[in-house]
Swiss-Prot record:
Lineage: Bacteria, Pseudomonadati, Pseudomonadota, Alphaproteobacteria, Hyphomicrobiales
Described purpose of this protein according to its UniProt entry: Functions in the N-end rule pathway of protein degradation where it conjugates Leu from its aminoacyl-tRNA to the N-termini of proteins containing an N-terminal aspartate or glutamate.
Principal location class: cytoplasm
Catalytic activity: N-terminal L-glutamyl-[protein] + L-leucyl-tRNA(Leu) = N-terminal L-leucyl-L-glutamyl-[protein] + tRNA(Leu) + H(+); N-terminal L-aspartyl-[protein] + L-leucyl-tRNA(Leu) = N-terminal L-leucyl-L-aspartyl-[protein] + tRNA(Leu) + H(+)
Entry EC number(s): 2.3.2.29
Gene: bpt
Keywords, in A-Z order: Acyltransferase, Cytoplasm, Transferase
One GO cellular component term noted in the UniProt record for this chain: cytoplasm
MF (Gene Ontology): arginyl-tRNA--protein transferase activity; leucyl-tRNA--protein transferase activity
Organism: Rhodopseudomonas palustris (strain BisB18)
Localization annotation: Cytoplasm
Family classification: Belongs to the R-transferase family. Bpt subfamily.
Protein's GO biological process: ubiquitin-dependent protein catabolic process via the N-end rule pathway
Protein's name according to its UniProt entry: Aspartate/glutamate leucyltransferase
NCBIfam families: PRK01305.1-3, PRK01305.1-4, PRK01305.2-3
Length: 258
């Protein structure tokens, strides 16, 4: 019998299931487990190839007749916020982001639960319990952090701590960028456009860290849930031939491969 090292990834294919993004279609995924001493290196490599992480699993679409899911990453150092995005930054000037270890809290879960109940009541995560949430945050063998976004308080300049929790981002730190694994926000703060604000904040953080990219996951043209990811330009989109650059003008060009 062939023996496989714990650090050698084994890939599996899921059975077809209804697509959550495009009505009338079915999805399949190829996945592997991110475990062992080289989990971080493997996560970097697979993310470069269009995979996403969910807990200790890396996956990517492997649908039979559809290629609508396109992995995208923002070119952080060249990004320039649009007029609308600058307004969102100004609207959230009273918000600070606190980088923390990937440790779940009851306060986070309260916001998470409110977000699901308002935004994704019938989605696949709708029934997640506090233990499920804890697993989502803690079950990681890679460099994962939590960013808590809080309203700035009178002592924030001294303590670095904000007041009430507004939003949370679960983020992986890769060798070439930040990967936004999952984010959520207080639904009663819709006017702040906190989802957009968190992406803009990640772009700024990547710049400060000297990291070239922010990985947003899958852009799906025509999907109300995923189409927004195409607004952050310039960005690169993964095609069969490699990463293709899309400029603010909408023009595209094949990027040199690393």
């Amino acid at each position: 019998m062939t023996q496989h090292s714990r650090d050698t990834p084994q890939f599996y294919l899921t059975a077809p299931s209804p697509c959550p993004y495009l009505p009338g279609r079915h999805e399949r995924k190829v996945f592997t487990h991110l475990v062992g001493g080289k989990a971080g290196e493997l996560n970097d490599l697979l993310t470069h190839g269009g995979f996403r992480r969910s807990q200790s699993i890396a996956y990517r679409p492997a649908c039979d007749q559809c290629r609508a899911c396109v992995s995208v990453r923002v070119v952080a150092n060249e990004f320039r916020a649009s007029r609308g995005q600058r307004k969102i930054l100004a609207r959230n000037a009273d918000v600070i982001g606190e980088l923390r270890s990937a440790v779940p809290t009851s306060e986070q879960y309260s916001v998470f639960r409110a977000y699901l109940d308002r935004r994704h009541r019938h989605g696949g995560m709708a029934d997640m319990t506090v233990l499920d949430y804890a697993m989502m945050v803690e079950d990681s063998h890679v460099k994962t952090r939590i960013i808590e976004y809080r309203r700035r308080g009178p002592d924030s300049g001294i303590t670095g701590r904000g007041e009430d929790l507004l939003a949370v981002a679960l983020t992986d730190i890769l060798n070439d960028g930040l990967s936004m694994v999952y984010s959520f926000f207080e639904p009663g703060e819709d006017s702040r456009s906190l989802g957009t604000f968190m992406i803009l904040d990640h772009i700024a953080r990547a710049r400060r860290l000297g990291l070239p990219y922010v990985y947003l996951g899958y852009w799906i043209e025509g999907s109300k849930k995923m189409d927004y990811k195409g607004r952050y330009l310039p960005q690169q989109r993964l095609a069969p031939s490699g990463w293709i650059r899309v400029d603010a003008s909408g023009e595209s060009a094949v990027e040199p491969q690393d």
